[in-house]
Amino acid sequence: MVALPTAWCSVALALLVALHEGKSQSAATSEEPPAPSARARGSHLRLRRCSCNSWLDKECVYFCHLDIIWVNTPGQTAPYGLGNPPRRQRRSLPRRCECYSTRDSACVTFCHQKPWPKASAVPGEGSPTDLLWTSKTRTTAGELLRRLRDIFAAKRNFTRHQQQKATREPESSHSRWRKR
């Protein structure tokens, strides 16, 4: 009979060999080469699939910059990890962004699709703040209020119906079982 510590060492060794073989097989079957570590690269390189024409276009920034941490703040959603805003002039390209690889079909579709919302720093044409102050919005405010009241009434009626149903039909927890 084998001693207990020897048996445990044998089991641990067999497990390590099996895990090592499994790891090497999965690495051999993967199609893409492993990414180099941060130390091997020298400095941290940001993973980007494209370059946005405007930093104010948050949807574009979120799509293009793959390693950004987004933090919800009370007034806005702020991207962290982008560094300082660019000090160059805004591009006058008709596209939303430029892809780094033309073979990335998702990126090409996203960057070159029309129409895409224009981002503006100052309230101007088409900005949400302008829409709040137009007379067109004020005329539909009554309709919005009516719809909100309808939604509230429907929710209230549904809740009352559920409460009445619960008090009317007290079901046993074992209603499907027959007593023998």
UniProtKB/Swiss-Prot annotation:
Primary localization: secreted
Pfam families (UniProt xref): Endothelin
Keyword set includes Secreted: yes
Subcellular location: Secreted
Transmembrane segments: none
GO terms, biological process: intracellular calcium ion homeostasis; regulation of systemic arterial blood pressure by endothelin; regulation of vasoconstriction; vein smooth muscle contraction
Annotated stretches, region: Disordered: 157-180
Region (Endothelin-like): 97-112
UniProt entry keywords in alphabetical sequence: Cleavage on pair of basic residues, Disulfide bond, Secreted, Signal, Vasoactive, Vasoconstrictor
Disulfide bonds: C50-C64, C52-C60
UniProt record similarity statement: Belongs to the endothelin/sarafotoxin family.
Role summary: Endothelins are endothelium-derived vasoconstrictor peptides.
UniProt-recorded name of the protein: Endothelin-2
Organism of derivation: Atelerix albiventris
Organism taxonomic ancestry: Eukaryota, Metazoa, Chordata, Craniata, Vertebrata
